[in-house]
């Protein structure tokens, strides 16, 4: 079967996807090892029998809703290719907004940055790649996530990052940071979106929090006060309807200069503040 023939068939079978053509192209790129430009320019290239079998198996899994990133084992974030697994969240484009806001507020001089609940290491590795002069500490309470983030750091040859197993601040007693960032669990366990799309295949522990999704956010806001240098920043990603509640939590905890930034879809996505000791 030719590349172009397989693409046509795959696109027709993936109409339930938000991006059937791109999904099909990614699977074809993954199995053949060819780039998109080659595939489109040489569409008459023949697939081997083995490639056809691999593609059919992947197509079935994608048709059943399994995330593309789980099928290929890789997701790009901040132009960094990251290994992913069902043990962690798949990095989302909107989380790059958190990285942008963090970079804009880091001091010019070298400093220490903490990423709580690092998962794949996406946020921490993006910051480390942009600020090689800074020391980044990334923590996660799940051993599989810690191993995956360490694998990503090693694969990308990023040296200015230390990845530890820690339940939020439990392994960080006495340490202080100029900035703390986190994309914590923030979805209400009753949210119907948990039964839709990619999140069905992701760990609930990385998605769901008590108190209508606010429990971990409030915990981080309160505990970060002891871990920030005076004037240090805390930046948190949250749900698009949680902006007001998160701002109030920052203010109640005594943070200053509290503001919420919008994501690429113009939704409130990242709230930040400064804490003065």
Curated annotation (Swiss-Prot):
Cite the HAMAP family for this sequence: RF_methyltr_PrmC
Q: What happens when the gene is disrupted?
A: Cells lacking this gene suffer severe growth defects, but also show a global shift in gene expression to anaerobic respiration. Also shows defects in translational termination via an enhanced rate of read-through of nonsense codons and induction of transfer-mRNA-mediated tagging of proteins within the cell.
Protein known as: Release factor glutamine methyltransferase
Q: Name one GO molecular function term.
A: protein-glutamine N-methyltransferase activity
Keyword annotations for this protein, in alphabetical order, are: Methyltransferase, S-adenosyl-L-methionine, Transferase
Name the GO terms of the biological process aspect: peptidyl-glutamine methylation; protein methylation; regulation of gene expression; translational termination
The entry assigns this protein to a family as follows: Belongs to the protein N5-glutamine methyltransferase family. PrmC subfamily.
Give, from the UniProt record, the effect of changing residue 36 to A.
17% of wild-type RF1 methylation activity
């Amino acid at each position: 079967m030719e590349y172009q023939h397989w693409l046509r068939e795959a696109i027709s079978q993936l109409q339930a996807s938000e991006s059937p053509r791109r999904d099909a192209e990614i699977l074809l790129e993954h199995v053949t090892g060819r780039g998109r430009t080659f595939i489109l320019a040489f569409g008459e290239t023949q697939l081997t029998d083995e490639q056809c079998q691999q593609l059919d198996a992947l197509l079935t899994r994608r048709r059943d809703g399994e995330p593309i990133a789980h099928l290929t084992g890789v997701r790009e974030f901040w132009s960094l290719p990251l290994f992913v697994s069902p043990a962690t969240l798949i990095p989302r484009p909107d989380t790059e907004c958190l990285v942008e806001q963090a970079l804009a507020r880091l001091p010019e001089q070298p400093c220490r940055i903490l990423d709580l609940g690092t998962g794949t290491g996406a946020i921490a590795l993006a910051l480390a790649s942009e600020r090689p002069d800074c020391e980044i500490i990334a923590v996660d309470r799940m051993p599989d996530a810690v191993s995956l983030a360490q694998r990503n750091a090693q694969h990308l040859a990023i040296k200015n990052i230390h990845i530890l197993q820690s339940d939020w601040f439990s392994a960080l007693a006495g340490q202080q940071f100029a900035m703390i960032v986190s994309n914590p669990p923030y979805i209400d366990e009753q949210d119907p979106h948990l039964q839709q799309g990619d999140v069905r295949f992701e760990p609930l522990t990385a998605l769901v929090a008590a108190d209508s999704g606010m429990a971990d956010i409030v915990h981080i806001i309160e505990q970060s006060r002891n871990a920030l240098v005076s004037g240090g920043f805390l930046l948190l990603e949250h749900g698009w309807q949680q902006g007001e509640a998160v701002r109030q939590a920052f203010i109640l905890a005594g943070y200053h200069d509290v503001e919420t930034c919008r994501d690429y879809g113009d939704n409130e996505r990242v709230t930040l503040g400064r804490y003065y000791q």
